[in-house]
Amino acid sequence: MINRNANRDRDRSRSNDKELKINYRIKAREVRVIFENGIQEVLSIEDAIKKAKEAGLDLVEVSPNVSPPVCKIIDYGKYKFHQEKRQKEQKKNQKVIKLKEVRMQPKIDTHDLDFKSKNILSFLKDGNKVKVTIRFRGRELAHTYLGYDILNSILEKVGEVNYVLESAAKMEGKTMFLIVAPKFKK
């Protein structure tokens, strides 16, 4: 017989792991309680829940992996709201850096090279990393120095932007590449 709810049950258990245990869901016998004013005390779970109820607040397990587990007496709704707000703020401030790739061959014309250099420049100004790839075919492999010359000329043209050479020109099989990243101001 196939259990059709197995995936649903597994997903529920994952979401419950992220949830904090509050009040009677805490399974430990003793807990280290941090009160609103910052005072710490080791209490039995019953006493800790009683003190939380007297204050009109919740006993929230903050750090379950310590012995005894650390709990705070706080308003759970406010605590969860502030945590979600902090996560949204961190996500908003997080900068996503993409890796853009510009491909070419060693037989590239000067105008095409200028055009590709402008593209690389715009990618770097947007804050993206750029992987410049030169693909060699057939007899072109005997003239890899052309690839180094092309990559050096690109770096000279891109020199007006502050950049960091993340990996110097390397040959991997029939391709030569380098990775350039923008230098961020701190």
Curated annotation (Swiss-Prot):
A GO cellular component term found in this entry reads:
membrane
Keywords assigned: Cytoplasm, Initiation factor, Protein biosynthesis
Record localization: Cytoplasm
Please report any disulfide bonds recorded for this protein chain, giving both cysteine positions. none
| GO biological process per UniProt | ribosome disassembly
Q: Name one Pfam family in it.
A: IF3_N
- A GO term, aspect molecular function: ribosome binding
Cite the Gene3D superfamilies for this sequence.
Translation initiation factor 3 (IF-3), C-terminal domain, Translation initiation factor 3 (IF-3), N-terminal domain
Q: Enumerate the NCBIfam families for this protein.
A: infC (TIGR00168)
Q: Oligomeric state and partners?
A: Monomer.
Q: What does this protein do?
A: IF-3 binds to the 30S ribosomal subunit and shifts the equilibrium between 70S ribosomes and their 50S and 30S subunits in favor of the free subunits, thus enhancing the availability of 30S subunits on which protein synthesis initiation begins.
What family is this?
Belongs to the IF-3 family.
State what protein this is by name: Translation initiation factor IF-3
* UniProt organism field: Borrelia garinii subsp. bavariensis (strain ATCC BAA-2496 / DSM 23469 / PBi)
